[in-house]
Amino acid sequence: MKKLFLACLMLLGAIQSWATGQEADIIYLYGEKWMLLGRPLDNVRDVKARLSLALPEARTKSTANPDGIVCIWSVQGTHLQLDSVAVIVGENKLTYPALGLKDPFDKYINKDHISASWVNGQLRAARGKQLYYEHTGYNRNYASEIFLTFKNGKMTDMKTFNNNVRTEGFDLTNGKVMQALQDGMDTKEYSELKGSSVLARISDMDINKSGELKDCKVRIIMRKNGYSTELTNHPLEKRVKNALKNLSPWRTLYINGNVIIPHSTFTFPITVE
């Protein structure tokens, strides 16, 4: 029965989809506290399942933290180790030294610590002002970020980035943008659109250093009688582009060595009159 329960826990973890922003773990890098935007324990699901059984069943869980577990890690020298595990029970935060939870981590005990020797690849740590956020997974960025590369738990590379806002302004989720697009769309002259619903799909936005839109890709999709049709080279494409170009400046960010445009892909409905 216990094996079956462990298997169920592993399966639930495997099919979990991050449909909301996820709570970060914590990592100490040479004494400094950072958010760890990832969950190294997800790569050892048998360990994670046993850990779940070893912790209080009444711990608080949420869509942002379905397991109700926050792990505290550190890099000692060049080696990643798991120091402790924290949970919330009622109004109390309980922290358990990882070494005291011997059963889940028996394969990774190295003298006086838990060696995260299963960790391979890249982890991202962050702190400071949040510059960008999407309500899914760890799709967010901060003023300071570090990319750590590991091989069998040993750090082989570390890259540090200082991020900032390049231009402040609009993005496609802004209500004023939505209103400007609706105001700029006169559909009365397009008889082929009557009785249908129409969507404009915007992507590939090209914005210059001043925050002005140079170009973008617009697709017009008409749905009528249960069928969807892309209207190639429809005049509405140009109208949407012009409406967007009349808005300035657009918000752009300098993130981890690249210029990005927040929410640069978006679909919005066009009201058909």
Question: Model segments located where?
Answer:
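Acidic, low-complexity proline/glycine/alanine-rich linker and hinge segments
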Residues: 154-194, 231-248
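Start-of-domain marker
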Residues: 18-83, 87
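Short tight loops/turns at secondary-structure junctions
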Residues: 196-226
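Short loop/turn motifs at secondary-structure junctions and domain boundaries
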Residues: 64-65, 192-199
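Acidic, small-residue rich beta-repeat scaffolds with periodic aromatic anchors
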Residues: 125-163, 203-207, 212-214
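Short, positively biased Gly/Pro-containing turn/loop motifs at secondary-structure boundaries
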Residues: 229-273
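Bacterial Sec-dependent N-terminal signal peptides
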Residues: 1-23
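An exposed acidic His-Trp-rich patch
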Residues: 83-141, 180-184
